[in-house]
Amino acid sequence: MVAFWTCRNAWFQHLPFAKRGDENAPSGPRRLRPWFLVLALGLAACSEDKSAPQQAAPLPPIPVGVIKITERPTHPQLSFVGRVEATDSVDLIARVDGFLDKRTFTEGQAVKTGDLLFVLQKDALQAALDAAQANLAKAQADADNLKLQTERARSLYKQKTVSQAMLDDRVAAEKQALAVVQQAQASLEQAQINLGYTDIRAPFSGRIGMANFSVGALVGPSSGPLATIVSQDPIYVTFPVSDKTILDLTEGGRTATDRSNVAVSLTLSNGMTYPQTGAIDFTGIKINPNTDTLMVRAQFPNPNNVLIDGQYVQVTAASKHPVEALLVPQKAIMTDQSGNYVLAVGEDNKVIQRQITQGSTFGSNVVVKSGLAVGDQVVVDGLQRIRPGQKVDPQIVDATTPAQKAMSVGN
């Protein structure tokens, strides 16, 4: 409004009738009509000049932190949920019927191979052994007698005083007696074995659990386990590996079941790292159709009995030998309807969106299988302030910053 009145006053100062005392100025409507037209045109021009919009100054490029993509030697690692399993586990079962006479261990204690654990009453089985010994002695005596009779019959047959039929009967009777001796010998051995079964010993070293029967209970093969023993050192950890992971591991000619290239470590349920490293000693031969996984087993030393049969642990399998890969921090990866993408800096420092294909994830990084190349600049800081097509001021993140350190996982 002020500009309008300033312009108006300037025009009025140049009008002839604005000067007082001009004797030659025309008077009346005839004198004013041309000058009103000039005045209107001048005011319109003044108004148009002042109302023209002013162009805004361009915004400066937004500073962002970027990393330059390079191939880095990394030790890829994968995590799985595993279960601890004893290398040996056995239920102690009485192999003969009898009353439990003794229990010689403390529940939960460590035992060694051959330690005596349970004793069954021996009386009945000892009596059976004595009877078997007597039967064997009788059978042996009968056999000896028939042997003498057979020898006498042969002598008489040579003298033609007995018939061939009688000799044959004596030979057959001797053979039957020898068979009875063998049968009695077998019965004696079985009685000795049964008597030996009354002493139940540890088949291997480990730890024994709770006793399921008290002293005096009648036990036998059908009564169930007396107790359970599990070995503890070394110990197994089994974990399933998905079909997809196996395919990822076999890319580039690698072998998914190459045990020599894998170091295995454990994280316990309290977050602590198990101090011993393990090695894969078995891989399954087929995929489980119900879970699409392959079972893998690793063996670990367990000198302090930290690992317990049935325990859940986190298994980390890492490559012993470095692998060249393009790595991007997870925080730089975003997702839309087309999949995963990153924001990169292109020509003229303008932001471009790059769709990527992810590979294995380990640490705080992701392997990029496609979509990026060596030398590309990927935005890692300031992602919330930019969009594709916007001009930015890329600032390389220094190698000592956390973002760049994330690219060196496994080195």
Swiss-Prot record:
Pfam families cross-referenced by the UniProt entry: HlyD_D23
Coiled-coil intervals: 118-196
Gene Ontology, cellular component aspect: periplasmic space; plasma membrane
GO terms for MF: transmembrane transporter activity
Family that this chain belongs to: Belongs to the membrane fusion protein (MFP) (TC 8.A.1) family.
Known function: May contribute to resistance to some drugs, such as deoxycholate, sodium dodecyl sulfate and nalidixic acid, in the absence of BepD and BepE.
Name of the protein described by the UniProt record: Efflux pump periplasmic linker BepF
